[in-house]
Amino acid sequence: MTNLNLPSIFVPLVGLVFPAIAMASLFLHVQKNKIV
């Protein structure tokens, strides 16, 4: 494994997983407080 191969996989993974977690936590927060 080269050092150049790691960011090419890690960056899109974080770029997709982090917003998904943020949206999920926000959705659960809104559902819990019923601000809709």
Swiss-Prot record:
Keywords: Chloroplast, Membrane, Photosynthesis, Photosystem I, Plastid, Thylakoid, Transmembrane, Transmembrane helix. It is a single-pass membrane protein. It holds the Pfam family PSI_8. The chain crosses the membrane at residues 10-30. GO terms for cellular component: chloroplast thylakoid membrane; photosystem I. It is found in: Plastid, Chloroplast thylakoid membrane. GO terms for biological process: photosynthesis. It comes from the Eukaryota. InterPro entries: PSI_PsaI (IPR001302), PSI_PsaI_sf (IPR036357). PANTHER family: PHOTOSYSTEM I REACTION CENTER SUBUNIT VIII, PTHR35775. Belongs to the PsaI family. May help in the organization of the PsaL subunit. This is Photosystem I reaction center subunit VIII. It comes from Nicotiana tabacum (Common tobacco).
